[in-house]
């Protein structure tokens, strides 16, 4: 088996494991918030930093493709005036593998004050970001596909797959 094939199989296994580890309550909670967002013609605001930010942009584009008003909000810009785009009826999907990303944790209290629903898509369900959110989607992986276990590979594949699945249902 080639190294490329092995990497693809490991990422596929991580996605399959994620499908098994998501609880029905988590999924139903996220879908209910997204349905409410669509019914109210509100926005889905998606945010993340680094590789999670890149995945967040892709998820926003996918939701826009199916007709839900969705946008990516850079959390740094949010802290410097762009939070004005977020309304109480909106839903915010926050992506972070660690769940401890400082910029997202700084945005969290502002979202709470606005009454904006928060869904955390995190690699650590016991993280600060998870504790500050209304719904937590567990996107944890055992290890990255990268030989050094450093580059976000399996974790970004899982986060993107969960985002795609949310948009597809």
Cite the ranges covered by each PLM segment.
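An N-terminal, well-structured beta->alpha segment
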Residues: 1-40
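Glycine-rich phosphate-binding loops that contact phosphosugars or nucleotide phosphates
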Residues: 35, 43-169
